[in-house]
Design a protein with these regions (language model features):
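Membrane-interface alpha-helices at helix entry/exit sites of multi-pass transporters
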Residues: 2-7
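A feature for the membrane-embedded catalytic helix bundles of lipid/isoprenoid biosynthetic enzymes
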Residues: 8-148
Length: 148
């Protein structure tokens, strides 16, 4: 149990730190506000899968997963590396969060942020349905309720 808890804890932290580190890197994005926002939503999405497992006993892997983020990150890094020799790695700037350069890596951070929101909502909805079905089939005893 301790190993499982430790594994889940470290996994959740690394999910967020990975996105944050890429967003904070000035060569890729350099935007702390975007990075923290993306890390927060990534963490929420990852957390909801673990929370569903803790409550229902069923692990929920739906949504934008770590594997999806890794593939997207790899594609973004390859695209960035291919564009740098042509001085074309920055496509422009968006005036949000104080100005965000549009690069393959900043797009990866934004997609990870939106993926985190979508994953959280998807996993929450599924877990809520699972809990409702469990409660309908086998409700937990309520304190102070009579056993009639």
């Amino acid at each position: 149990r301790w190993g499982d808890m430790l594994d889940h804890t470290i996994d959740r932290l690394l999910d967020a730190v990975w996105v944050l580190a890429l967003a904070l890197n000035p060569a890729f994005c350099g935007q702390a506000s975007l990075g923290w926002t993306a890390a927060w939503f990534t963490l929420l999405g990852s957390y909801m899968g673990t929370q569903a497992q803790a409550v229902t006993g069923l692990r929920n892997y739906r949504g934008f997963s770590r594997a999806d983020r890794m593939v997207l990150t790899l594609v973004s890094l390859v695209a960035t590396a291919a564009l740098i020799p042509f001085d074309a790695a920055i496509f422009g700037t968006v005036d949000v969060f104080g100005g965000v350069p549009i690069t393959a890596m900043s797009l990866m951070v934004v997609v990870s942020m939106l993926g985190g929101v979508w994953t959280f909502l998807t996993r929450f909805r599924q877990a809520a349905g699972d809990v409702r079905r469990m409660d309908a089939k086998d409700p937990l005893p309520q304190p102070g309720a009579s056993d009639e």
